[in-house]
């Protein structure tokens, strides 16, 4: 227990210093280190157990006793606490709590003569500025608001800024919160105000909207959600093809007079939207050379290349360079079946 340790005469006996010398014994230096460490431990206990009624009388008395000793040591000698205490205690006891004549922790930063310990949370330096007319030992973080700011997750995208006010309820576990995202405890109440996500990924809770509108963080120019039509193929919508209709082609397969041209579908077979060649970007965004039509058999991700070939009768025809199926042969099979499901079966083969 902290109280049992303080009952030892080792802590209660006053330390003697040589006012005319800047040197002290090793024993006195180590004793002063332990006294400061005890005061820091009591400060941590007071912060954890702080409530609306204030800390317990026992804790208040212990803090008062330790802070009085520290004040006397720092003002009656030319040696400052910073010169005596030059150590880093693993970030555990680097803060000395406030003390004033009211025998309780105070948040008063308006006194003209303050003895400030400005503790930098990043490098844990103990800086002490001594004034002879001061009755306060102030722990001032961030210089103005008396908040202890712990910045965790410095290597992640989101830094945690947890501001704790010593006037309200504190939870010591929150000092080590490594997964927070801008959770600030308000200085005036106990409400947890969650700030807006800087990545602007707040999605509107209205799940009935199919386009998933973003709430207050997405601009009105966001492209709408594209609804895919329910077709047998993601490339061509076969439900738009009338297989009963007579097939016509601008390409003449009877002779080789139009060998330079490529097979095309008439407007009566496919809609104008589906008859457009699919141009996909490859590499650094350079579009592939558009082809007149895709192969209905293999459905490659990009437009297949066509090569010239001959059928059994010796006629020059266009063949898919990927699967080798004739364009006209496929259409002929689809027409003869007069069944849309047969098209799907041919695709799956």
UniProtKB/Swiss-Prot annotation:
Q: Name one GO cellular component term.
A: nucleus
Low complexity composition-biased segments: 95-169, 177-195, 257-272
| Annotated stretches, region: Disordered | 95-227, 250-294
What keywords appear on the UniProt entry?
A: Metal-binding, Zinc, Zinc-finger
Which domain of life, per UniProt? Eukaryota
Instruction: Report the InterPro entries cross-referenced here.
Output: Znf_GATA, Znf_NHR/GATA
Enumerate composition-biased segments (Basic and acidic residues).
Answer: 196-212
Zinc finger feature spans (GATA-type):
295-323
Picking any one GO molecular function of the record gives:
zinc ion binding
Known Pfam families for this protein?
GATA
Give GO BP annotations, semicolon-separated.
negative regulation of transcription by RNA polymerase II; positive regulation of transcription by RNA polymerase II
Task: Name the SMART domains on file.
Answer: ZnF_GATA
Gene3D superfamilies found in the cross-reference section = Erythroid Transcription Factor GATA-1, subunit A
> Which regions are flagged for Basic residues bias?
278-289
List the protein's name.
Answer: GATA zinc finger domain-containing protein 24
């Amino acid at each position: 227990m902290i109280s049992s340790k303080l009952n030892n005469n080792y802590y209660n006996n006053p330390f003697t210093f040589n006012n005319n010398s800047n040197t002290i014994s090793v024993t006195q230096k180590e004793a002063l280190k332990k006294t400061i460490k005890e005061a820091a431990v009591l400060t941590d206990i007071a912060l954890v157990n702080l409530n609306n009624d204030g800390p317990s009388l026992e804790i208040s008395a212990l803090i008062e006793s330790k802070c009085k000793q520290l004040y006397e040591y720092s003002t009656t000698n030319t040696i400052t606490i910073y010169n005596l205490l030059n150590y880093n205690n693993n970030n555990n006891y680097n803060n000395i709590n406030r003390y004033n004549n009211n025998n309780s922790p105070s948040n008063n930063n308006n006194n003209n003569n303050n003895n400030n310990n400005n503790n930098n949370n990043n490098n844990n330096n103990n800086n002490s500025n001594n004034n002879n007319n001061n009755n306060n030992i102030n722990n001032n973080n961030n210089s103005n608001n008396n908040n202890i700011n712990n910045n965790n997750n410095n290597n992640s995208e989101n830094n945690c800024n947890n501001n704790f006010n010593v006037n309200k309820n504190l939870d010591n576990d929150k000092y080590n919160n490594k997964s927070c995202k801008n959770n600030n405890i308000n200085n005036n109440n106990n409400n947890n105000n969650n700030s807006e996500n800087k990545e602007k990924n707040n999605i509107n809770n209205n799940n009935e909207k199919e386009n998933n509108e973003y709430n207050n963080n997405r601009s009105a120019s966001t492209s709408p959600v594209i609804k895919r039509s329910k077709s047998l193929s993601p490339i061509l919508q076969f439900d738009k093809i009338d297989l009963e209709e007579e097939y016509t082609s601008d390409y003449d397969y009877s002779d080789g007079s139009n060998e330079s041209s490529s097979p095309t579908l008439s407007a009566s077979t496919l809609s104008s939207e589906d008859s457009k060649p699919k141009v996909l970007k490859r590499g650094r965004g350079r579009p592939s050379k558009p082809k007149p039509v895709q192969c209905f058999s293999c459905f490659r991700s990009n437009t297949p290349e066509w090569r010239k070939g001959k059928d059994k009768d010796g006629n020059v025809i266009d063949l898919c360079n990927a699967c080798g199926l004739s364009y006209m042969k496929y259409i002929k099979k689809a027409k003869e079946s007069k069944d849309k499901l047969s098209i799907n079966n041919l695709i799956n083969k």
